[in-house]
Each structure stands twice: as structure tokens, then as C-alpha cells.
Amino acid sequence: MAALARWCVQRRLVAVLLWLAAFGGVSAAAAVAGSAYSNDYAVPGTEAGHAARLLEQGFPELGGDTDSVVWHTSSGSVRAADVEQTMTRTLDRIADLPGVATVSSPYADRGAGAVSADGRTAYATVTFADGAEDIDRGQAQAVVDTAKGAESDGLRVELGGSAMSLTEAPGGHLAEVVGVVVAAVVLFLAFGSLAASLLPIATALVGVGTAYAGIALLGHAMTVADFAPMLGMLVGLGVGIDYALFIVTRHRRGLRRGLSVTEAATTAVATTGRAVVFAGATVCIALLGMLTLRLTFLNGVAVAACLTVLLTVAASVTLLPALLSFIGPRALSRRERRRLAEHGPEPEVPTGFAARWSALVERRPKLLGALALAVVAVLALPTLGLRLGTSDQGNDPTTTTTRQAYDLLAEGFGPGVNGPLTLVTRVAGGEDRLALDNLDATLRTTEGVASVTPVTYDSAGTTARLTVVPDSAPQSERTSELGDRLRQQVLPRAEHGTALDVQVGGVTAGYDDFADVIVGKLPLFVGVVIGLGCLLLLLAFRSVGIPLKAAAMNVAAVAASFGVVVAVFQWGWGSELLGLGRAGPIEPFLPVIMVSVLFGLSMDYQVFLVSRMYEEWLETGDNRRAVRIGLAETSRVINSAAVIMISVFLAFVLSGDRVIAMFGIALAAAVALDAFVLRTLLVPALMHLLGDANWWLPGWLERRLPRISIEPPECRAAALDRLTDVVAEVEQIDAAARSPHNDH
């Protein structure tokens, strides 16, 4: 690491130009190739997936995206001559637009079912030639503009569907800008130097920007969800600025000790840079743990996020030292430079609030530890009510046309019309057709069913489908129960004695199947992530207790963050106020991605905190001193890093995307809890209570473990010399604090 840092400092212009060339080249390639994101929730082997394949084979004309144009009259009927004339003309214009395959009108012979019972709401179905992921935003906008052109006093027109949601996609990068600005303010307050505060941001932006373009190219090679670039940017900005902050802090410490700019930058990368690489590796390993689930949808998310972390780490240990050499001593504030020139290098002694807090934790570990546990328990309680499901356009903000179309359909035709179940089967002969006719009658009397469409056969007569509309909303537990009832009770009885094998599909059933698969694989996934993280910490700190405590802290942080997400998004505490739409279930893939990201981020703080304690333990063998000094020296930088990360994560609530907002709030809550409760309260309290047992490792395991070190051996001796003055002064302070008052 020292050699790499020295090369980057000595050839700083080359290092900067190489990064700019990489950023420009990848961005240009992404602009030429375009994006190819896909939200494919299909899971091999599920019933909904099988139903989708049968439907595609028997009814290929249904393969395009299907959207709705909904209109509502404030008075009178949608069958009024003027309304019918206006909307018929509008639908004809939509049918002539590029990309539109067919338009079904409620005014056609078979359109009676598309008019509400009160006659005030009607809808038309617009089928595109392509799937939603292949539809150009301009095509969707043309449909919206044409439909909206029919609005007048008393006639309201709204549009819903996957393609229509493309027109609601927020433009610009407000969330990223807000996050970066807040981070810059925090960095300036921490450093007192404008130049030093801008370097972590510049480093993170180059690394994340290169990764953002790289993810667009990655979408051409594998399935990558459309939210993956934003998720990568969210995580990348957070960890990228943090990693650079740690290195700049160490560099500034070297300058204050009198080192040259080159020596300070080289030492910072050789020491803290190693911790950054180790921390980044833990994040990547946690993210790649998603590959064990073998779900195509999540593989792309894992690789995309991992790519972002890798590039931010690389920028932190190569681009950053080059930039540090450019600004020279201006990494220090004017006051620090003046003090250094007047008084020379001074030993750093932990003082102020950090030192007092560390001493308080040492004196009251049981009380403060119990308080921290109580906070974690309260925040984690809502997690017990976690319900997985997929949000739909009913969760969109009330100002969007997709949400208003959803509500109009639910009010006019019942809540289930927004999430029907599709039944598909192969048909072998007359007996099967007779059984399907009987099934139609049976379904109409089944609990939870609002209506059933007549059976429709393909042109060859070998595949049949019918649509079941529930009497409950798509996100309701009653709808999920209806799907289970059909699969386990109603359909097996109808199939008895026939060759039928009716499959229950549709978007709602597909989401339920996806959630079931995720829940089934979650224990294995969590075990793999925890196991790999513990193994890394075991190798780094050669202790059994440190990895086990880290695993427990990570589980606590995850549970508490899920509790916050459940309260905001599932229970709806403030979701409408924040512009996040109405309450609904939690996305089924959120726990998997959150466990990966949070375990990685939590390991970061664990590494930076415990590595300093471990260094002190190796030098003194005094656990109480190691914990006290480690907490006092790292708490300020960890808290500054946490404030930056929280600011970046919360800024993504402004993205307008419900999924990204979930990630932002969950990550912000977890980092806040981790930094201000777990790492500065519970972890040191437990380490004080456990004493030397923190560092226990069985002899047989000690002999077999390979040796890796976050701090390089050559820096260990230098650290001992460097801290001699600090040790002496701290001991004097301790002695003075313990001595009784005298009479002088």
C-alpha cells in the first residue's frame, strides 16, 4: 500500500488523468450503448412463472405491456353522447400512436364490463407492442398527452400501468445534489479547510460516476434492476465519502505531527488505507452473498453495488493521495498551519467531549449498555409485524396520474380490479372444457372472489385462461389468502378426474411467489453473510469475542432499521407527509439487499473502532485502556462519517422512488443507531465488561489461523514511538484524577 501511495503522489498528474480517462471513457460507452435495465421478478420453478410461460405460448398477443386509460365524470354518465364522442376520438388517436398495438374501448360491443355500475367511470385497455422495459419514455408520454387532451370541465382522465409510470419517473439528481452539499458542509466543519473538505467528495464522485456508467453497460450483459444504479449511487456516495474522510483525517494528523505532504499521504494510505480496503472487502463479500440465493433479479443488484464499492475504494487509495499532494499543506486549516509554524509538532491527546464520553462509558458500562439495549429493542419492535409484498401504483404519491387512475378504478370497479389473478391451463379435450365451464361457476361462489371473466381459448383450442378479480386490494392479506385457497383447495377439486393442471398467475401471484422464495432462502443467506463477516474479523483481530459481538451488533442494527421501515412504509407513519405515497407492504427483496449492505457498513465502523483498540491492546495489554483510548480517538471521526452517510442516505428520500426511499431511510436509521448507540455505547460497554476475554483465542486455533494485519508491521513500531508522549500525558491525567485534593 505504501508503494502504491508513493507512486500516486509522485505521479499525481498521471493518476488523476488515468481516473478522468476511465470516467470519460466508460461514460461515453454507456451513452452510446444506452441502458437495458429489467425488473424481472420471475423465479424458476414457481407456479406464477409457469403460468406466465403458458400464457406467452398460448396468447402471444398478450406479451406487450398493458396499460389503462381511465375517465370519470363529475356529473352525468360516461355514456353521454358528448363524453362517448370525445373519448372514442381520443382512443382512436391513441391507437394510431407509434408502439401501440391495440386499444379496447368500453363503447365496443363487449365493453360493458369496463363501465362502472354507477355509470360515472370507464376505462380502456391500451396494449403496447413491446414489454414495459422496451417501451421508450417518449412513446408513453405521447399516450399520456393524447389522453389528457380529452379533459374538460366535468371530465377527468387519468392513466395507469407500467409504461405510464415511466412518465412519472423523477428527472434530475436532486437527491444526490442535496446529499453532496450536506456532506460538504459537515466536512468543512470537521476540517476547517475548504480544500480538504472537497477532496473526499471529488474522490467519491469520480468513483461513483464511473460505476454508474459501468452499471448501464452491465445491464447489457446480465439482468440488472432499474433501481440498481440509484442504489449503487446511494451506497457508493455514502461509503466513498466516508472512506476518503478516514484517509484525509489520518493525512491531516500526519501533517500536524510535522511529516511532509508526501510522507503524510503515504502513511495515511499505508495505514488507514489498509483498513479502507479491508472494510470495502467486507462490504463486497456481504453484497456478493446475494449470489447464494440464485435469483437472477438479485444477481445484477449484487454485482452492480459491488462494482460501485470497488471503484470507490480504488479511488480512495489511488486518486485521493494524488489530490492530497496537489493541495499540499492546505489540507490543514489556516489556524492549524499557523500553530504548526509557531509551536511545531504537538502530541495529540484525546480531549474534549470524546475523552469525557469514553471515560463515562468506562465508569458506567452496565447502565449505559442497558440503555443502549433498550433503545435497540424499542426500534426493533415493529419488525415483528413485517409483511413482505410488492408496492404498486396505489402506493404512488397522490399527485401522480398513476395513483389517481388506480384510485378511480378501485372506487368504480372494486379494489381487486387493480390486481387480478390469471388462471391458465392446457386443454386436452371435451372433458377438460366441461370441467373449465364448471370451474367458472365454482369460482364465482368462492370466498374472496368479486368476479370472473368467461373462459378464453387460444386459436388452437389447447390453452385456456380466465381472470379472477378478488374483492380485496392487491396488497391485502386476503388477496394472498385467496391465491393460496385456489391453489390448495378449489383448483385441485376442479382438476380431479381430468387432465387439467390449472396454474395461478398474474402480477399479484407472482409477487407472492417471489416473496415466499425470498423468505425460504433468507436464513441460509443471513448465515452465509454473518459467517463470512465473522471469519474476516477473526483473521484480522485474532479473537473469538470480537466477531461474535460484531455479528450481534449487526443483527441489532438490521432489526432496528427494519423496525423504522415498517413504521414509515407499512404502518404509514409520515409516509404521505414525506411524499412517499400511502402505506403498504415491504418489498420482498428489501431484507436481502438491506442485510448485505448493512452488514457491510456495520463492519466498516467495527473495523475502524476495534482496529485502534486492538493496536493499543497489542502495545499495552491493558483492555480498559485499549477500549478507552480507542473510543476516544475514533469516536469523532466515526461520528462525522456517520453524519455524512446519514445525510446522503436521507437525501435519497427526495428521489421520488419508493424503493430507493426505503433503502435511504433504512440505511440512515441503521447507520445512526450503529454509530451513535452501538459503536459509541454498547460495544465499548460490553468490551469493558468482558475484559481480557475480548481478545481470547484458543491456542490450537491461534496456531492454525493465517496472519493478516490491518496495520502493516512497519507501522507498528512507529506507532509505539509516536504514542509514547500521548501515553505519558494520559497517565498523568489519570493519576491527577485519582489523587485526593491537597491543602496547598
Write out the residue ranges for each language-model feature:
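Short, conserved active-site loops that position catalytic residues or coordinate cofactors/metal ions
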Residues: V32-G34, T66-T73
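Membrane-embedded transmembrane helical bundles of large multi-pass transporters/channels
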Residues: M1-S35, V100, A117-T121, G131-L388, ...
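Short beta-strand segments
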Residues: V70, T125, T249
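Structured non-transmembrane domains adjacent to transmembrane bundles in polytopic membrane proteins
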Residues: G45-T66, S74-G161, G385-E576, V607, ...
